[in-house]
Amino acid sequence: MSSEHISGGGASKTKKHKWSSSQNRPKPMGVSRQERSVPLVSPSNSFASEDDHHMLKISLSSISKLEVRNLKRKLKSELDEVRSLIKRFDPEANPGGSMAKSGVVGRSKKVKTGNGGGKKSGHGADKGTVQIFKNCNSLLTKLMKHKSAWVFNVPVDAKGLGLHDYHNIVKEPMDLGTVKTKLGKSLYKSPLDFAEDVRLTFNNAILYNPIGHDVYRFAELLLNMFEDKWVSIEMQYDNLHRKFKPTRDIEFPAPAPSIAPIVEPLPAIVPSPSPSSPPPPPPPPVAAPVLENRTWEREESMTIPVEPEAVITAPEKAEEEEAPVNNRDLTLEEKRRLSEELQDLPYDKLETVVQIIKKSNPELSQKDDEIELDIDSLDINTLWELYRFVTGYKESLSKKNEAHGFGSERDAESVHNSIQEPTTLVSGTTTSRVTESGKAIRTSSPARQENNASGSSSSNSSSSDSGSCSSDTDSDSSSGRGSDNGN
């Protein structure tokens, strides 16, 4: 009688069997004792070549679980011995990396290379790009299923159609079927290459066929359809690559400090001409014609400070307009002024402002018509382009006002700053602004001033005539009184 421990199905039982002396334990079918023995790496043969080992495959289903456990224990013990030997030779080496070099885990190396260590692994790692290519495939499928796309789904058979001059005009033939094949084989490095081939297909048809031809009209229709659908895919691609831009920009912080000292001295040079008297003489010729064409009648000395302010601000604005050449950052005052000017623009000019902003922010085209603008979030080039647009509009507006006799916009601003609550009355060519204190500043043309002078002289003569008349009446009255007293 002998006992055997049998395990299976999660439970263990002890059974007694009768065995004769001649009987042996049943062996697994198909696997001999020699086949079960696996050569293990030991200290004596760890550096032997693979030819010295007899690598045999073991079917785990043909042996018992107890033998599997024993086999695992032996393999683990041998593996620990190999790792200890590797650490003795190279203590700083990584055990996993050293074992990969020694050939012990040669099977794992095959698995790594077999899972797509080439293009598939790199292409699959970028999930965003894979999704974009899927969107490209769906867009191409819609184009090919269109009722007018049958002409472009296959290459042009120039010989069969008798188009002998086709290849002379069309240098690079392309069709949607070829694009589909290249997209399926992952031959496009980026979605932009896919878009170029689709455009090339329709542009070739537009180039070869005359205007009004059916193929010409089909090509225009499908090209417009593609461009409408491509906008969203292109935005996804731009947003995906924009996320990785900060990692590239981190490599360039070193040159920034060297550029900063060059930009900082510029603001220090700009305010210097305002306090000193010698620098202002060059700019006055620009503002001098404006002052010569306007004659100011000042009733009090309170209005005198208005004139130097208009003269001083002229060179500052000239320097500000020259500043964008250096692409410097706008100052806080310039940003505040730009924000105010943008709010004061008429509705027809806001469309141009939106187009300027969309150049650096293409994703705004997919949003609502209402755009919330943050001046600080815009880049330098966009800010300067907006600044030049606003200043150009103001200059054109001031020229129109001068042509109609309303004076320059800068003069109007300086007068507006010196008067708290102006009330404007316009009659003919004379404009008067009345302050709270009742003082008035009048602006008139030279011809009007001459008329005023002639009017004042006539009023003076009339006053003298009235004076003479009054003197005659006084003399008559005095003579009358004398005669009465005599009587």
UniProtKB/Swiss-Prot annotation:
InterPro entries: Bromodomain, Bromodomain-like_sf, NET_dom, NET_sf. Keywords: Bromodomain, Chloroplast, Plastid, Transcription, Transcription regulation, Transit peptide, Ubl conjugation. SUPFAM superfamilies: Bromodomain (SSF47370). PROSITE patterns: BROMODOMAIN_2 (PS50014), NET (PS51525). Residues 320-401 form the NET domain. Residues 1-48, 93-127, 400-487 are annotated as: Disordered. Residues 1-32 form a transit peptide. Residues 451-487 have a biased composition (Low complexity). It is found in: Plastid, Chloroplast. The keyword Ubl conjugation applies. Residues 400-414 have a biased composition (Basic and acidic residues). Sumoylated by SIZ1. Interacts with SIZ1 (via PHD domain). The NET domain could serve as an interface to localize different proteins or complexes to chromatin. This is Transcription factor GTE5, chloroplastic. It comes from Arabidopsis thaliana (Mouse-ear cress). The lineage of its organism: Eukaryota, Viridiplantae, Streptophyta, Embryophyta, Tracheophyta. The gene is GTE5.
